[in-house]
Design a protein with these regions (language model features):
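Conserved AMP-binding/adenylate-forming
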Residues: 1-82, 88-91, 104-105
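Glycine-centered tight turns that cap/initiate beta-strands
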Residues: 18, 113-116, 171, 177
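Active-site and channel-lining beta-strand-loop segments
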Residues: 20-27, 175-183
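Residues embedded in well-ordered beta-strands
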Residues: 20-22, 40, 118, 132-134, ...
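Short, charged helix-to-loop "capping" segments that act as catalytic/coupling loops
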Residues: 25-40, 153-170
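AMP-binding/adenylate-forming catalytic core of the ANL superfamily
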Residues: 45, 50-51, 73-167, 184, ...
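Conserved Rossmann-like nucleotide-binding pocket used by diverse enzymes
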Residues: 69, 174, 187
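Acidic/polar alpha-helix N-cap and adjacent early helical turns
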Residues: 193-203
Length: 203
């Protein structure tokens, strides 16, 4: 079907000959291949870079454990294809699970009234991190209505098993514009710094 064809084309693909590709958890153990459990993507192959020029420490970290650490998060599906879901620096680690900020953003962006969205993880004593969502809304839309749509849509994805139960945001913040980098990307580093002291207990 057209839907299956689109889904196939969005995959990164299968590793080629001589490529040893793994998806691992924080203890460098391979994650279960269940089409939803994600981990860090690491690889080794004869043609991969040996490291950084004049930076032995960074090179050592890059090849920690004998594999090149790509900095990407994803999973290998039941066909053996790699699907990248996020960057490891942007992943939200909550309740012992890795939650894709991009997946949350994709879901929320489809809600009526949302012009732009960013999902970030804020440090939490109990759960490690908790997700919060920053939304730039369409001017005429009511924030309470948008909140309801966002939580309902995320709840539906959780019920379907497409999202972890820990993905429900503790807080939704509204701004006129979401901060960008010099190349026009959402500046999540700045957002994490800006909202690091936010009280997630206040919904």
């Amino acid at each position: 079907s057209q839907k299956e064809l689109i889904k196939m084309r969005t995959k990164t693909g299968k590793p080629g000959p001589l490529v040893d590709l793994r998806v691992v958890d924080e203890n460098y153990k391979d994650v279960v291949r269940d089409n939803k459990s994600t981990g860090e993507i690491i690889a080794r192959a004869p043609w991969l870079t040996n490291g950084y020029i004049k930076d032995k420490e960074a090179s050592k970290e890059l090849w920690k454990g004998g594999y090149l650490h790509t900095g990407d998060v994803g999973y290998i599906d039941d066909t053996g294809s790699l699907i990248i879901t996020d960057r490891i620096k942007d992943i939200i680690k909550s309740g012992g699970e890795w939650i894709s900020s991009l997946q949350i953003e994709d879901i929320v962006s489809k809600c009526k009234g949302v012009k732009e969205v960013a999902a970030i993880g804020i440090k939490d004593v109990k759960w490690g991190e908790r997700p919060i969502i920053i939304v730039a809304k369409i001017a005429r839309e009511n924030t309470e209505d948008i909140n309801k749509r966002i939580r309902e849509r995320i709840s539906n994805e959780i019920k379907k098993g497409a999202l972890s139960k820990w993905a429900m945001p503790d807080k939704i913040e509204y701004v006129k514009e979401i901060e960008k980098t010099s190349v026009g990307k959402i500046n999540k580093k700045l957002l994490r710094e800006k909202y690091k002291f936010i009280n997630t207990n206040e919904k």
